[in-house]
UniProtKB/Swiss-Prot annotation:
Protein name in UniProt: ATPase 2, plasma membrane-type
Domain of life: Eukaryota
Regulation of catalytic or functional activity: Regulated by an auto-inhibitory C-terminal domain that can be displaced by phosphorylation of Thr-947 and the subsequent binding of 14-3-3 proteins. Negatively regulated by PKS5. PKS5 phosphorylates Ser-931, inhibiting interaction with the activating 14-3-3 protein. Positively regulated by PSY1R. PSY1R phosphorylates Thr-881, situated in the auto-inhibitory region I of the C-terminal domain, causing pump activation. Negatively regulated by the secreted peptide RALF. After specific binding to FERONIA, RALF causes phosphorylation at Ser-899, mediating the inhibition of proton transport.
Primary gene name: AHA2
Membrane spanning residue stretches: 62-81, 94-114, 244-264, 274-291, 644-665, 671-693, 710-730, 752-772, 785-805, 814-834
Subcellular location: Cell membrane
Binding site for Mg(2+): D588, D592
Residues carrying Phosphoserine: S899, S931
Domain notes: The C-terminus contains a R-domain composed of 2 autoinhibitory regions (863-885 and 904-919).
UniProt cross-references to SUPFAM superfamilies, sorted A to Z: Calcium ATPase, transduction domain A, Calcium ATPase, transmembrane domain M, HAD-like
Signal peptide start and end residues: none
Gene Ontology MF, one: ATP binding
Membrane topology, Extracellular segments: 82-93, 265-273, 666-670, 731-751, 806-813
Enzyme class: translocase
Amino acid sequence: MSSLEDIKNETVDLEKIPIEEVFQQLKCSREGLTTQEGEDRIQIFGPNKLEEKKESKLLKFLGFMWNPLSWVMEMAAIMAIALANGDGRPPDWQDFVGIICLLVINSTISFIEENNAGNAAAALMAGLAPKTKVLRDGKWSEQEAAILVPGDIVSIKLGDIIPADARLLEGDPLKVDQSALTGESLPVTKHPGQEVFSGSTCKQGEIEAVVIATGVHTFFGKAAHLVDSTNQVGHFQKVLTAIGNFCICSIAIGMVIEIIVMYPIQRRKYRDGIDNLLVLLIGGIPIAMPTVLSVTMAIGSHRLSQQGAITKRMTAIEEMAGMDVLCSDKTGTLTLNKLSVDKNLVEVFCKGVEKDQVLLFAAMASRVENQDAIDAAMVGMLADPKEARAGIREVHFLPFNPVDKRTALTYIDGSGNWHRVSKGAPEQILELAKASNDLSKKVLSIIDKYAERGLRSLAVARQVVPEKTKESPGAPWEFVGLLPLFDPPRHDSAETIRRALNLGVNVKMITGDQLAIGKETGRRLGMGTNMYPSSALLGTHKDANLASIPVEELIEKADGFAGVFPEHKYEIVKKLQERKHIVGMTGDGVNDAPALKKADIGIAVADATDAARGASDIVLTEPGLSVIISAVLTSRAIFQRMKNYTIYAVSITIRIVFGFMLIALIWEFDFSAFMVLIIAILNDGTIMTISKDRVKPSPTPDSWKLKEIFATGVVLGGYQAIMTVIFFWAAHKTDFFSDTFGVRSIRDNNHELMGAVYLQVSIISQALIFVTRSRSWSFVERPGALLMIAFLIAQLIATLIAVYANWEFAKIRGIGWGWAGVIWLYSIVTYFPLDVFKFAIRYILSGKAWLNLFENKTAFTMKKDYGKEEREAQWALAQRTLHGLQPKEAVNIFPEKGSYRELSEIAEQAKRRAEIARLRELHTLKGHVESVVKLKGLDIETPSHYTV
């Protein structure tokens, strides 16, 4: 017999030898290992997970200096040391050291924050680590898959991702999806004794298995070593690249203009030109942008996890912010998934069988441990759960699977006779019992009555097994009865749906139940009853009445879909995406995985299977719809912070490049590159706090609108550049400030002008963040305390430098407190128009400005054709009155809504009001009575008037 070391070195072929030999080679039994044996073996085989590549901390740190934005700064450093050494002056060591310091500071912050975010993410993902049922010390328990070692006995069931390579023990064949490993699209049937591979998904069946390989020794582990993961460039990275390219191009344009004007035209000295180019390079590059955005997402991701939504993919946050359609499972998300049975409504179809016996048969066909919601409800209806197995001996249990849609128990009674009971979908049980047409019609009519009251149906059948073997087909099945299942809506679902509607998120119900049940649930939740059976839209037998309307339009307008199969979910998502919607999809089962993958945001609900979690982008740890809507709001707040910063970054690039370019070219004033470095360092320190800023989430779905970011940045940055140019002109060429405020003139002192321009640029540049972070007036929306404190500290430092600094190398001299006060006043006065520009850009980009100017002709007034019709009507009225005629009824005097966009907005508002009104009705006495009457099936006339 070989040792465990031989097993580790794979000198023994455990895949092919008989199963009994496997136990001998692994020195284990069908009773599993002890905890001590497991700990000893993990020292030999290592943990059951793939080895993570250890990354050098130094290389990771230096990696933050290796991106296009950093390259520009590094080019500036090379210019400062290599090119800036002409005209008898030494190399620009101060700027070189300053640039290196800026790069190191930025990389250090990035490194620390990403490290913290990585640790937080690792802690969160540990909660999502695959779990498995393992037999240790003779007891079954759920453990992390990482503790598995060869020799462990594990339980595999529907929806599980197989945790290690294993050989199947006795039981029914298993259907396994190996597409992730082998590319086979169809599930493979695995029989007892055969091997199943780590990473494949159980599609059908339940069985025990003995682990033969773990971690890097598995088939999956070996393949992972051979294949390097491909890095897909996400949408977020593309946006980051686009903004970075815009800033770099803006700087390049400014530099080309400076080179053309300064050298051939103005005949400036070589060194002066280099210094001016350095100003544009250092001041224009938003070096902190990758750090700020990644830190903002990491902190936001942590905040989402605290609300019960763990993000597996960081960029899912931006997609969540833009989500406008949410396809939500009914069971467990909109409802409690706590089923109850009204015994009075149970229907019996077998002579000599009581209603209590129907319930007992249903409980017998249920699991007594490791239950799903239906099993728990059936066993819970018994006075004592032990009754489900009292007086019988279990021979074989057939677990639920999506194909058969039923469970079954083969058992031996006290007399030694063999029987089988089954519960499941009525259609499947009717087919199983080969029911007559009359019986089928009767059953289906009762199912419809249940459905009208919002009740699901569960059928029960029984048979005798005279052959007394578990494989035998048995005697004909007998249809025993029908049970009504009530799954009450969550108490917060109706309110959450109303909130979602107000946030611009259309919630569509996805249910496998009948259409009538879906409509009744939709009515109770106030989400509308415009629902379709998915087979009528997407199946092979499509509804002829709907054939004239495009399927995409029907799906887009629907409030929900009933009778949904997993493949329909995928098609629903696909059709909605074709209509340019950002779609979220919830799911919990193995068959939901394709739809979760296809959706822009796949959401695995609480208690989802491993397969669903693996396919999703966000995993919920709390049940219900409210956690999703809270996550939407939080995602929008996170996205708002990122968008605010990108507008700010573009604005600063424009204001620095074109402000200093104009001053350098018009007045040949050479601003100090070192002072621009000081501005950049103080700005970066302040702007890091934006990741924790207080913001108002967008009231509608939001997304990266590069046109808006660039337009806003150019206008705000351009305005600030002009204000700096005007300030410089007033201080350098006029005595306006001296005459108005009584400060001494600095018009002929370039060093003091340097201090004045530095302070003005520093204040107004950093204050711009308060404009870009707010949707309304910037002084109305209170910023976060950290941002405010950072701004005040940075500007106090900037003011002290401007007042007292006397640095010859930076060509700056203190201007005194009088000038500092004047500059602060000038900055405050020029700050206020920034909000107006922001509103104007938003209005122009919305399309309404051009529409009102050219089509509706209502710009600057709400009257069509600029009030032409009203003026004509008034003139006509005056003329008729003048001639003694009766005034004619004025037609079309009042303004019309001539825009399709406005009409659609009005329709949307009306729809919203109708939904809220319907919701409010449910909370009135009338709505409550009608709901109870319908639920109980009472045959009474509900009064038409109520007095409350």
